[in-house]
């Protein structure tokens, strides 16, 4: 969903076909007004650019427009899939194009308008292999053929500590009440998930299960041992979320967790080790944002209903509505229909992907439907 370097691979795993605009959402015939508590948008620093004076001017213009459209939640990227960060960091590597504290400046402008800000982390991708990741190549996922993947391995405690350290740094430097997780999963590939087959991961797996994965030849779901391997790796991602929750609690502040997740909980658990249904049941996250990027109203409704059930009473669900994505190109009417469905299904709100696609016709539709 984010940087192009990994997007093609990830999006190939989940082909939600384009469909015609949903019934009842034709242009000129808009659905009933939505009334949702959370009206959010995913945002990238590139929308504003690296020149501070120009960026600040555009921030003010865009956020004023958003306020008029009833947008109250901003999910702003602070770590991209290359590993660069957009805040004043002593741990991570700032994007060299931004020689100033982009996030701090943006946060101040959002606060003036009473908007909630979620610093958004693309957690495990590290495509540029920067900083500490460059110093620790053993952190990268290694395939059975010893091919390196441009993402770090959630199974390794040092990796989890590094990524959590970045999040704690933001929480300690800035007055934020949320941390937003994206790419909190393994890389996906249609034939086989890219779990780590490095020596340390295999040692940890054997220590926990007694199984020497290096001796397993039949790597398919017909093999019970392979299923143990899938479950164990999925569990490492959940361990990360659990460790993050504990670390945030240790700051002495109330900092909540939101997470962008794949739209189907069952497939996500098996294909990418992202058991977000369990996170909802356990209350490990406070908000789930399943990315349901489709124009098919019935499919959208089905997936939102399933997601809300996963959230239960402990986690609010605010589905991601695709405005302009690789999966769909929405319309203002289609957007409003999906908002209406979300409200009917008792979702806690919606989040739009993304700011770069939220053109004036969409904002005008939001202004008239508050």
Which residue ranges define each predicted feature?
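Aromatic-lined substrate-binding rim segments of carbohydrate-active enzymes
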Residues: 63, 80-122, 232-251
């Amino acid at each position: 969903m984010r940087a192009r370097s990994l997007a093609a691979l990830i999006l190939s795993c989940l082909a939600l076909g384009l469909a015609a605009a949903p019934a009842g959402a034709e242009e000129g015939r808009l659905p009933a007004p939505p009334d949702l508590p959370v009206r959010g948008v995913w945002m990238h620093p590139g929308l504003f650019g690296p020149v501070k004076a120009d960026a600040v001017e555009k921030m003010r213009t865009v956020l004023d427009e958003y306020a008029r459209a009833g947008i109250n939640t901003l999910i702003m990227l602070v770590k991209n899939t290359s590993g660069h960060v957009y805040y004043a960091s002593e741990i991570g590597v700032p994007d060299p194009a931004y020689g100033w504290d982009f996030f701090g400046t943006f946060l101040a402008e959002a606060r003036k308008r009473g908007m909630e800000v979620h610093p958004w982390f693309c957690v495990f991708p590290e495509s540029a292999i920067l900083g500490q990741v460059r110093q620790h190549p053993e952190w990268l996922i290694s395939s059975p053929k010893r091919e390196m993947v441009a993402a770090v391995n959630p199974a390794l405690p040092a990796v989890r500590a590094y990524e959590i350290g970045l999040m704690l740094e933001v929480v300690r430097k800035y007055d934020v009440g949320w941390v937003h997780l994206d790419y909190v999963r393994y890389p996906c590939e249609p034939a086989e998930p890219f779990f780590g087959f490095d020596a340390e991961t295999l040692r940890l797996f054997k220590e926990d299960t007694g199984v020497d994965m290096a001796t397993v030849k039949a790597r398919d779901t017909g093999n019970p041992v392979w299923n143990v391997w899938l479950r164990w790796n999925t569990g490492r991602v959940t361990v990360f979320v659990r460790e993050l929750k504990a670390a945030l609690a240790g700051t002495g502040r109330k900092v909540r967790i939101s997470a962008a997740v794949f739209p189907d909980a069952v497939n996500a658990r098996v294909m990418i080790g992202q058991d977000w249904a369990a996170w909802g049941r356990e209350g490990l996250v406070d908000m789930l944002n399943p990315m349901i990027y489709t124009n098919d109203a019935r499919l959208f409704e089905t997936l939102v209903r399933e997601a809300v059930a996963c959230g239960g009473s402990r986690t609010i669900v605010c589905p991601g509505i695709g405005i302009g994505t690789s999966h769909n190109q929405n319309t203002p009417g289609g957007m409003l229909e999906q908002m209406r469905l979300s409200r009917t299904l008792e979702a806690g709100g919606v989040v739009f992907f993304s700011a770069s696609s939220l053109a004036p016709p969409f904002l005008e539709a939001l202004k008239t439907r508050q």
